[in-house]
Amino acid sequence: MSVAELKERHMAATQTVNDLREKLKQKRLQLLDTDVSGYAKRQGKSPVTFGPTDLVCCRILQGHTGKVYSLDWTPEKNRIVSASQDGRLIVWNALTSQKTHAIKLPCAWVMTCAFSPSGQSVACGGLDSACSIFNLNSPIDKDGIHPVSRMLSGHKGYVSSCQYVPDEDTHLITSSGDQTCVLWDITTGLRTSVFGGEFQSGHTADVLSVSISSSNPKLFVSGSCDTTARLWDTRVASRAQRTFHGHESDVNTVKFFPDGNRFGTGSDDGSCRLFDIRTGHQLQVYNQPHGDGDIPHVTSMAFSISGRLLFVGYSNGDCYVWDTLLAKVVLNLGSVQNSHEGRISCLGLSADGSALCTGSWDTNLKIWAFGGHRSVV
């Protein structure tokens, strides 16, 4: 069989798969008689309301000289680590806005960072295809450089996301442009498991984000440029447990719902979606109508501790607060006083849910606190 014939058969098979996938999508829509917001409205649920003082900017963290790409909170809620295009990690005291550490990175092209559960170490990764671990208690050398305590090497593409396994300083999961996710043993620096790659159930394009379930740390989800999200069990690396379809473009961010039974996704198609890991069904779409202009991409997301609110960052500088039950925007932090002046690249909620931190291409981070009559939701 010639190369041309093989190519023709491959194109025909691809078209068949796409046609079947579309039929499956339409059948699911027929069987799914309602979504979360439709059910909530029929039950007479009232929307969450926000006043002008219910979520206010209380701190501006200034110190980076380049675009902020990633941030993470410590479990004890009073420190934040941020990664920037300026090639530095900065650890901040969220209560005083003071810097406690400024770490110059061996590779300036950093894309992600994470705090260890104990708060004693930070991890970062980027275009060097490695994940670097820094012990914050290690002394700096004579040149003022903070030494790398462990280098996790093995990916064949950039490291797009990293997250420590909850309650463990010894294990971490990374996602990469090589279409895989990896579970690492930080103590040895070795890969424990590789998810995807040569396995047929893996992603078929760059993996951009991972999120580990806090209720079951053996489960994590990944989002990819192949427009899908996949559920993995760290005990079974050979195949994804489920594949979730619905987005029409890159899935930039994934985040588990607080109960661990659902997760959210955000995409370049401008929408966020809520999926159930037990049934595989899409429960809700969070999407603002736009005109004929460019649709802002979803860059980052976080749920409130109850799951009633969804905080979403967008490429145009907007930061919507969604009512997850009624699928309505209750506040746009991009239109209030002290809003960012550039793309919202990352955001995260403190462990107790009392504060939100946003990072932007305007080089700043901002901490937003609940005030007025609004308690933590």
Curated annotation (Swiss-Prot):
SMART domains: WD40. CDD domains: WD40 (cd00200). One of its GO terms (biological process) is G protein-coupled receptor signaling pathway. Signal peptide: none annotated. One of its GO terms (molecular function) is signaling receptor complex adaptor activity. WD repeats lie at residues 63-93, 105-135, 154-185, 202-233, 246-276, 293-323, 339-369. G proteins are composed of 3 units, alpha, beta and gamma. PANTHER family: GUANINE NUCLEOTIDE-BINDING PROTEIN BETA G PROTEIN BETA. Guanine nucleotide-binding proteins (G proteins) are involved as a modulator or transducer in various transmembrane signaling systems. The beta and gamma chains are required for the GTPase activity, for replacement of GDP by GTP, and for G protein-effector interaction. This is Guanine nucleotide-binding protein subunit beta. The gene is GB1.
